[in-house]
């Protein structure tokens, strides 16, 4: 059963998951499917790496074949399990062995598990898609987790759409938690997005790929360099 027994006090949280504001946003490279891309992202300066465990994703990672190389990544880099409406059994499998530092969940059917997930001690990120420029996408006051990710919307997709939204909307969402900006970010536009949204972190998948699931290392390097170059 999923409960506080899954908690591991011995695992130190990477900086990405501490909630401390820096002079520039943290960077998360998402949808990583192989060790070469993970290592390159870290060498270029990524603070976190996301692994998509949703079978319906173009970036789906078969976890059983990836545990060894994921666990070998530097401990100061946040390893984030990304899921879409996962079952309790799936979440328990992901949390086994402290392979991941945090959970990032898309969809809504997992909401009833939020309090139990927080009790495990794993930081929880709720990912939502911005569909309407005139209102908050859903009521966020109830959410007990670590952070909220705002992503672009495309019907039928749960993330990694490459779609942007009005970045300045993030400044209106006062929820007392770190806000992560995602959706359509690229090396060419991430500085402008940061200046408008002032997020805690930026998240990118499509914008640094040569094809779904395969990262373009030059784009990753340029994206991270662009974020690092944002003036305080």
Model-identified regions with their sequence ranges:
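Conserved N-terminal beta1-alpha1 strand-loop-helix module at the mouth
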Residues: 2-232
């Amino acid at each position: 059963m999923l409960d506080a027994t899954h908690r591991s006090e011995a695992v130190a949280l990477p900086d990405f998951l501490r909630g401390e504001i820096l002079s520039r946003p943290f960077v998360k490279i998402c949808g990583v499917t192989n060790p070469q891309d993970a290592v390159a992202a870290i060498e270029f300066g990524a603070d976190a790496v996301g692994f998509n465990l949703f079978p319906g994703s173009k970036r789906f990672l078969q976890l059983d074949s990836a545990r060894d190389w994921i666990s070998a990544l530097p401990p100061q880099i946040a390893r984030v399990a990304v899921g879409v409406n996962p079952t309790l059994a799936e979440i328990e499998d992901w949390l086994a062995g402290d392979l991941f530092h945090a959970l990032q969940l898309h969809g809504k059917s997992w909401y009833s598990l939020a309090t139990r997930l927080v009790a495990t001690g794993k930081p929880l990120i709720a990912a939502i898609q911005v569909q309407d420029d005139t209102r908050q996408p859903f009521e966020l006051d109830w959410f007990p987790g670590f952070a909220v990710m705002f992503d672009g919307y495309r019907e039928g997709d749960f993330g990694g759409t490459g779609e942007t939204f009005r970045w300045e909307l993030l400044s209106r969402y006062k929820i007392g938690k770190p806000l992560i900006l995602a959706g359509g970010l690229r090396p060419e536009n991430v500085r402008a997005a940061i200046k408008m949204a002032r997020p805690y972190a930026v998240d990118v998948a499509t914008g640094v790929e040569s094809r779904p699931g395969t990262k373009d290392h030059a784009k990753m390097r340029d994206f991270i360099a662009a974020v690092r170059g944002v003036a305080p």
